[in-house]
Swiss-Prot record:
Its cofactor is Mg(2+). Signal peptide: none annotated. One of its GO terms (molecular function) is glucosamine-1-phosphate N-acetyltransferase activity. CDD domains: GT2_GlmU_N_bac (cd02540), LbH_GlmU_C (cd03353). It comes from Shewanella sp. (strain MR-7). In the N-terminal section; belongs to the N-acetylglucosamine-1-phosphate uridyltransferase family. In the C-terminal section; belongs to the transferase hexapeptide repeat family. PANTHER family: BIFUNCTIONAL PROTEIN GLMU, NUCLEOTIDYL TRANSFERASE. The active site is at residue 360. This is Bifunctional protein GlmU.
Length: 454
């Protein structure tokens, strides 16, 4: 029996006041609908039907490379009408799971519980109890069993008092779903084809209906405007921060970090305020991350330290390596064990060897730097000739004086010393001292120019 997921994503989202389709608005740098798609993959969906309408070009540009079946809902005539657009891709033996593109916080564990609650050939609906259920469809029960769902605008006074509400998420057998969708009517207060009406049909047909509930009501909250979007963002961040703390991270203030990807942490990780994680970030044990640091798609080994306001992107820090404050590691940069870069040092496609250091104000690009190397302040690897990049190789135990330019391609041999202010254009042999600056002159009796008064 295949799991066929239908995601409703056709709405415009007028209250967002945006040209962007509502489901493309982001939570943690990822569109709401992408969160839902990813969760569908997590539970082992065999197929995903995306019912779309407004903003088709933008949706396809954002999601087009994924394995989705695109089902157009040309007119928005209700949730039942939306699901009906997916019928051509639904087999009778499928279990159909209906999700919503603007409900991004639904968790895989909740959907797995819902699917487990569905009886053989029966229906399972996800419900939640709210102290204030205003605006939501109510779950109508008789002797404890679900017999229907009534929408707010169609409910009587007794039904309005019910606090168990419909989330819209449900699991339904494919064959029965097709039958029930064919019976839907728009004879209601909103003139729409309600998906919720199939629950009363299921009851009338003697089909067993079970319910499940999420761990938290926030999982089933949608975003219709930017205020609600911001509320979902905060809820998502709080949930992800809690995961990090449970895994072994000490967050100085859990409300002042941003997690925009997949973060894995070891034990005793210290994270100061205003740190941002993006993409896939892997952090070892006993790592310290200073305030305002940004970590993007990087790997940080045990005992490493990232000092405040450093940016680590597509890079690696080895055991006990340190970067910052105000350091920048760009893609392809790597600090080996005990290596250090300080403030205003930038690296790209460069390796700084074991125990080597660049304390301040340097650019190291397209460089292979050995162990025990000292890079003086103001050092630049001149790697670009206007058309191509070239490699600089600095072997072990080299001392590079301040304000040195290394014009690539160039190799500096082991133990060499480069005098401050030198411009190196040729290879340097092992243990050589190279000084290329102009000889210092002393002129006695020098008179400074005097400004002429007008």
């Amino acid at each position: 029996m295949a799991l066929n997921v239908v995601i409703l994503a056709a709405g415009k989202g007028t209250r967002m006041r945006s040209d962007l389709p509502k489901v493309l608005h982001p939570i943690a740098h990822k569109s709401m609908v992408q969160h839902v798609i990813d969760t569908a993959h997590c539970i082992g969906s065999d197929a995903i039907q995306l019912v779309y309408g407004y903003g088709a070009d933008k949706l396809k540009l954002a999601l087009g490379e994924q394995q989705l079946n695109w089902m157009l809902q040309a007119e928005q005539l209700g949730t039942g009408h939306a699901v009906a657009q997916a019928i051509p891709n639904i087999d009778d033996n499928d279990t159909v799971l209906i999700l919503y593109g603007d409900v991004p916080l639904i968790q895989a564990s909740t959907l797995e519980a819902l699917l487990a609650a569905r009886p053989d050939q029966g229906v399972a609906i996800l419900t939640v109890n709210l102290s204030n259920p205003t605006g939501y469809g109510r779950i109508v029960r008789e002797q404890g069993k679900v017999v229907g769902i009534v929408e707010q605008k169609d409910a009587n006074a007794e039904q309005l008092a019910i606090n168990e509400i419909n989330t819209g998420i449900m699991a339904v057998p494919g064959k029965a779903l097709k039958t029930w969708l064919g019976r839907l009517s728009n004879n209601n207060a909103q003139g729409e084809y309600y998906l919720t009406d199939i629950i009363a049909m299921a009851h009338a047909d003697g089909v067993e209906i079970n319910t499940a509930q999420p761990q938290s009501a926030i999982e089933v909250e949608g975003a219709n405007n930017r205020v609600q979007l911001a509320q979902l963002e905060r809820a998502y961040q709080a949930r992800e921060a809690e995961k990090l703390m449970i895994a072994g991270a000490n967050l100085r203030d859990p409300s002042r970090i941003d997690i925009r990807g997949e973060v894995t942490v070891g034990m005793d990780v210290m994270v100061d305020v205003n740190v941002i994680f993006e993409g896939k970030v892997v952090i070892g044990n006993n790592v310290s991350i200073g305030a305002g640091a940004i970590l993007i798609d990087c790997e940080i080994a045990d005992n490493a330290e990232i000092k405040p306001y450093s940016i680590i992107e597509g890079a690696k820090l080895g055991v006990a390596a340190s970067a910052g404050p105000f350091a920048r590691l760009r893609p392809g940069a790597e600090l080996m064990q005990d290596a250090h870069i300080g403030n205003f040092v930038e690296m790209k496609k460069a390796v700084l060897g074991v125990g080597s250091k660049a304390g301040h104000l340097a650019y190291l690009g397209d460089a292979q730097i050995g162990a025990g190397v000292n890079i003086g302040a103001g050092t630049i690897t001149c790697n670009y000739d206007g058309a191509n990049k070239h490699l600089t190789v600095i072997e072990d135990n080299v001392f590079v004086g301040s304000d040195t330019q290394l014009v690539a391609p160039v190799t500096i041999g082991k133990g060499a010393t480069l005098g401050a202010g030198s411009t190196i254009t040729r290879d340097v042999g092992e243990d050589e001292l190279v000084i290329t600056r102009v000889k210092q002159k002393h002129l006695t009796g020098w008179q400074r120019p005097v400004k002429i008064k007008e």
